[in-house]
């Protein structure tokens, strides 16, 4: 059976450190604050939101929600972003993505003040992540993947890694970050001819396809480390599933993250870390 790479120990250690840094900022009269912008009521967004609110409370970050209907107009959403930009009491902004059809996500991303972009939404932050240059923050989930691997001592230097998914939110950023750590990375996607073979050849698989159970038993082998980034709500089952078929993979692989309880727990801690760092930069 696979070793379960649980996110709680990683998040707990980060939270303790961040709470001390947050308390020091509060003593200086600065209360770290995060604005969470949610459009609609997707279950995966709601799950992330609940986790983010709990993490902020534990660290001492003031979190405020900006809740907009799924049929919000582009102008209304942009106005909400501009309000956040103009509010000096807000140090970071988290916008749940993807946005509903009809909204221009690129225009919204470009409108956010890069200094408040704690999840690599703006072009400037994304450039930092992909190039390794600049001061922008990496996507929280991508950074959480590396934090988990580091915590459990998974060797990346020279390792073969298959990243399943090429979105700008997770896939491409985490591939770039792994490459910067000297891993040999293969990015897989919908046009990959033999996904299972590419995954089996890897030492580490990062599943970020955004589709439940994309990685089945034919795509894994003994000794592998499998990081499941997926958060997929199954209406019929009434629960969350990852991108990996957990029940099929667990008896085979060497180590595996659960969903929930894996990457997601660390992601909220990284989000809090970015908010604290944004404040520390602002008050230097």
Regions found by a protein language model. Give the residues of each.
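Short beta-strand segments
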Residues: 38, 94-98, 164
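Short beta-strand elements in bilobed, periplasmic/extracellular small-molecule ligand-binding domains
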Residues: 56-70, 185-187
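N-terminal glycine-rich anion-binding loops that anchor highly charged ligand groups
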Residues: 24-34, 40-58
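Short, well-structured alpha-helical segments in soluble
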Residues: 76-88
